Amino acid sequence: RQRHPDCDKPPDTKRCTGHNPAFYYNPRRKNCERFSYGGCGGNGNHFKTKQLCHCHCHEND
């Protein structure tokens, strides 16, 4: 599976509709980490679950 093109972008933490728990891929740590997604806009580097984040962004060494 090809990696999501936004996996290397920083998480968008600006507030919009609230605090939505989500996960983003941290390319420096090569791991999915929790953050608070503001609910609108941003980029594709936000996922509802850690499993989805890992599936779309994990790098196979």
Swiss-Prot record:
It is found in: Secreted. This is Kunitz-type serine protease inhibitor homolog beta-bungarotoxin B5-B chain. Expressed by the venom gland. Its main location: secreted. It comes from the Eukaryota. Coiled coil: none annotated. GO terms for molecular function: potassium channel regulator activity; serine-type endopeptidase inhibitor activity; toxin activity. Disulfide bonds join 7-57, 16-40, 32-53. Keywords: Disulfide bond, Ion channel impairing toxin, Neurotoxin, Potassium channel impairing toxin, Presynaptic neurotoxin, Secreted, Toxin, Voltage-gated potassium channel impairing toxin. Belongs to the venom Kunitz-type family. GO terms for cellular component: extracellular space. Residues 7-57 form the BPTI/Kunitz inhibitor domain. Beta-bungarotoxins are presynaptic neurotoxins of the venom. The B chain is homologous to venom basic protease inhibitors but has no protease inhibitor activity and blocks voltage-gated potassium channels (Kv). Pfam families: Kunitz_BPTI. Heterodimer; disulfide-linked. The A chains have phospholipase A2 activity and the B chains show homology with the basic protease inhibitors.
